């Protein structure tokens, strides 16, 4: 059963410049779709959409839920050599219809309970904002 995170939107800005990044985007997106009833916006900024051509067919094949239920993919064509992540995030926030917005990195998967505990804390007004940082290798 998927956990209810329906009042949240994961925003994931991407530029897929390597096979590793493609694998990570597919893995994280499938993880979110399979485990949570939530909203997801992925915006790819690049000359051509690698996500649409290579990731979407795989996701449609491997994910057992309707991926399009609360999922929005946006491709913005750009010849810009640099990826302006913050600008893309600002654009994506404007697309959100939920009060809770999760700036999500496509290279990260946390334990499922981390998502549900954070969501509950925000919904119960215990937290206004949460930030996850990975522990230092020295810790």
Where do the PLM segments sit?
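Glycine-rich, basic loop-to-helix element that forms the pyrophosphate-binding segment
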Residues: 79-95
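Short beta-strand-to-loop acidic/aromatic patch adjacent to the donor-nucleotide binding site
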Residues: 99-109
């Amino acid at each position: 059963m998927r956990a209810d995170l329906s009042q949240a939107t994961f925003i994931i800005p991407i530029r897929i410049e390597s096979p590793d990044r493609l694998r990570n985007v597919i893995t994280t997106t499938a993880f979110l779709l399979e485990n949570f009833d939530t909203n997801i916006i992925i915006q790819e900024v690049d000359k051509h959409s690698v996500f649409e051509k290579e990731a979407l067919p795989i996701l449609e094949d491997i994910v057992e839920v309707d991926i399009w239920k609360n999922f929005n993919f946006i491709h913005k064509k750009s010849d810009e050599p640099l990826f302006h992540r913050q600008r893309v995030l600002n654009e994506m926030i404007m697309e959100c219809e939920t009060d809770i917005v999760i700036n999500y990195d496509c290279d990260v998967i946390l334990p499922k309970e981390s998502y549900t505990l954070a969501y509950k804390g925000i919904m119960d007004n215990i937290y206004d904002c949460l930030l996850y940082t990975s522990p230092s290798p020295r810790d």
